[in-house]
Amino acid sequence: MKNDIAIMADPDTVTGFMLGGIKSGFPVHNKEEAKTTLKQLVDDEYSIIITTEKIGDELRDDITKYTGSKALPMIIEVPDKSGSHKRETDPMNDLIKRVIGVEMVK
């Protein structure tokens, strides 16, 4: 499935992204389901995996393991229906720095 985009999130977020045109949606209901689904998406070679900030925080070690210093898969974290979470570091800034080598200034 190279070069495909997938959304892995709570059912409401998955529905919203699929209505917006994402064809591969994977609703998850708990951390264990999310962990298993993330591994499957990486194994299936999805290029971009969209997930929520909440799931990203829960699976931070797994995300770091799968992305490492590679450009793909790109795992993008978005707010869920409850809004954005306060974080010490911004995963998007970390992603940009890792992929293109430039640190974004706030």
From Swiss-Prot:
Under the heading InterPro entries, the entry gives:
ATPase_V1-cplx_f_g_su, ATPase_V1-cplx_fsu_bac/arc, ATPase_V1_fsu_sf
Q: Which residues form the signal peptide?
A: none
The GO molecular function terms of this record are:
ATP binding; proton-transporting ATP synthase activity, rotational mechanism; proton-transporting ATPase activity, rotational mechanism
The lineage's top-level taxon is Archaea
What keywords sit in the KW lines? ATP synthesis, Cell membrane, Hydrogen ion transport, Ion transport, Membrane, Transport
Q: What GO CC annotations are associated with the protein?
A: plasma membrane
A Gene Ontology annotation in the biological process aspect, one of them, is:
proton motive force-driven plasma membrane ATP synthesis
Q: Where in the cell is it found?
A: Cell membrane
How would you describe this protein's topology in the membrane? Peripheral membrane protein
**What family classification does the UniProt entry report for this protein?**
Belongs to the V-ATPase F subunit family.
Matching entries from HAMAP family are given as: ATP_synth_F_arch
What function does this protein fulfil? Component of the A-type ATP synthase that produces ATP from ADP in the presence of a proton gradient across the membrane.
Q: How does it assemble?
A: Has multiple subunits with at least A(3), B(3), C, D, E, F, H, I and proteolipid K(x).
Q: What is this protein called?
A: A-type ATP synthase subunit F
Name the gene: atpF
